[in-house]
């Protein structure tokens, strides 16, 4: 520790209050962030002789100073701790990928509610069900609701402009409220039954439909009875196919931890409305040598800090901090009925299945991780890079590609490979402007100057390897940019396509004068290079197409005489995009504010001519 940091005096002055502490290294970087009910007791515990965790002991040996922040409550400390962990990403904290974009099923607050797949903040008017572990689980549930309750899924703009029932009505998946085939009261009843189904009352809904069917039949309303019969048949089929369990109606998260080969998997299974919706595995970083219970606690703290916690948690291990769940529930304004580590009945089978799935996911990850690390090693050996384990894990590869269509909507892409895997959150797109259309060399010069100018300014990291999708010409442009910026050209490598553009025949072109190298189609190093190059190409093309489509959509409407920015916006908002405008009738177009019958005819002719 530095001479100006008196540990003994510092510990003596710490208060017996809740708060957050940060262990800092000699450079002032946060190595570890934690919360405490009692700062004095918690921080002092790190400086005892016998620490249980070798990893934490290693961290304490590097501590140069400690920062503390006193909070008004332990709940406030928990919130601050989570925010600091997310922003600082300390290297000795167990870290989980910040994934808050879980999908929900939304039943809108429309007069004729629609069911929809939804991601994002749950702030729109309507009822939200979830979260679901993946998009597949949401879409499967929507299909069930379509089959059984025939609720609409169309956008409001489409709903407002239908003149006849759509195909979904013809195949029995929608009751066509858009054209008045079903009464508002009957549709509202279907929505209510769908909500009850999602809340786990499937059996009760089934009994209610059966009673209504028998009543309709008794009263000789045979068409209504037939509809209810079909509805009951569809629901019966769903109940037979799905695992619908009566466990008191409480939504449940099942969390199991598995460890092997120095790696840990936390598997989260979600049960909503009595339906097991599937699993989602998480693989934390900085968890080497940690006990499963500690990893589980870190997951619970980070996962539920900003998200809703269900009433029941079923866990494979007891949480070391027994008060954590209560703090999270208090912070989120939710009621957690209980945390179970030795569940009975169906919850026990859920936990056993979650544990098996955690072990299977971990086995797959270990196999894939070994293969990925092997490819990184092969590439490092082929290019004479450092091959120790730490250097390989830290090897950052960036690949640049240019994409356009005959010079239109030129975009450059930069994709990043790090920690033996692609890192989509680090990808970037660059709109290329001020060049001659189709001049790929000028486009490459512009993107490299913009990206690596930030390196020279100290605002961005320098990758260990820079791949250029192109041959000698593109590499020469890149070399010139690096020389101008004072950067090492040894990290520049071009990937030149082989004869017939066949995969496996690529040649590596070096900016520093080394002779070109053909690794061969069986090379693990070339497989990795091809993966990164192809990902850059894919990312560039999707961005270019989106930009081109946006430009064309706007320009096609603006080219029509009488259509300015305001009318264009009204048309696009009313019909949900250019395709909706194109499919609208003249009468539909004329119903938009500011669009006369004459202008509607002109728009229709321009889009269909």
UniProtKB/Swiss-Prot annotation:
Membrane is among the record's keywords: no
Predominant cellular place of this UniProt entry's protein: cytoplasm
UniProt keyword DNA damage, yes or no: yes
Annotated localization: Cytoplasm
Domain UVR: 203-238
Signal peptide bounds: none
Keywords: Cytoplasm, DNA damage, DNA excision, DNA repair, Excision nuclease, SOS response
GO biological process: nucleotide-excision repair; SOS response
SMART domains, alphabetized: GIYc, HhH1
Record's GO cellular component terms: cytoplasm; excinuclease repair complex
Single GO MF annotation: DNA binding
Annotated ranges, domain GIY-YIG: 16-94
Task of the protein: The UvrABC repair system catalyzes the recognition and processing of DNA lesions. UvrC both incises the 5' and 3' sides of the lesion. The N-terminal half is responsible for the 3' incision and the C-terminal half is responsible for the 5' incision.
PANTHER family tied to this protein: UVRABC SYSTEM PROTEIN C, UVRC/OXIDOREDUCTASE
Family per record: Belongs to the UvrC family.
Subunit structure: Interacts with UvrB in an incision complex.
Designated name of the protein: UvrABC system protein C
Organism of provenance: Bordetella pertussis (strain Tohama I / ATCC BAA-589 / NCTC 13251)
